[in-house]
Amino acid sequence: MYGDLALQLVNSSHRTTLSSTPQLPLPKYALPLILSICLETRQLGTSIASIAESHGQLSLTQDRGLVCNLTVQHLAARRNKRCMLAYLATRVGGIKERWWDAGGGLAYLLSPAASASVNPEADAPDLRSALSPQELDFLRGYNNLLLDYKSDFLDVLDLTAGIEKPPGEIMVDVRVVRDAGEVFLDSGERVDFRKGQRFRLERAQVERLIIQGYLEEV
């Protein structure tokens, strides 16, 4: 039946928005389903054009059954388009959300480390494999746009810093939960973050590592 594939696409996208998990893995881009919907839409367009051409203008104004048939096909094609746009808009929102959750760290976001806690039964092991080539281009462009925007006042404000829990102190005690290796802090100090170690450092120096899951506050 017309529209069944589009409804399946929207339902699969809607289910991901119902979860309360903040780091819900983005489902893999549904390319086969998208192509099937596009094919159905093109077939509807071809059918509408063929019927309209074969019956002529006079029949289109007098034959109510014919008008009803064309209207149903036209509405089905428009519905397919709306469903695909809703699906893509949901994914774009999810991509942006994950960029902010990662503190603007694009390399980390696209690495397997960012999906270390993802359900092994997920259809995509990491974000990179879940995105289409066009979505990857969008993510890189979005990243470049935000980096360019915030570069003018980076010494005053970091837009990617979390604001849900404002820091209460300048210094913070952290424990390394995942090896990060040697990191040069803004102060020039070199710190070797190994799992299990504890440090007391300025929050601003390690905020990004906390967001990315290498460190946790203690």
From Swiss-Prot:
GO annotation terms (biological process): DNA strand elongation involved in mitotic DNA replication; double-strand break repair via break-induced replication
InterPro entries: GINS_A, GINS_bundle-like_dom_sf, GINS_Psf1, PSF1_C
Keyword Nucleus applies: yes
Localization annotation: Nucleus
Residue pairs linked by disulfide bridges in the UniProt entry: none
Keywords from the UniProt entry: DNA replication, Nucleus
Keyword Membrane set for record: no
GO cellular component, one term: nuclear replication fork
Family: Belongs to the GINS1/PSF1 family.
Subunit structure: Component of the GINS complex which is a heterotetramer of SLD5, PSF1, PSF2 and PSF3.
Function as written in the Swiss-Prot or TrEMBL entry: The GINS complex plays an essential role in the initiation of DNA replication.
Name the record gives this protein: DNA replication complex GINS protein PSF1
The encoding gene: PSF1
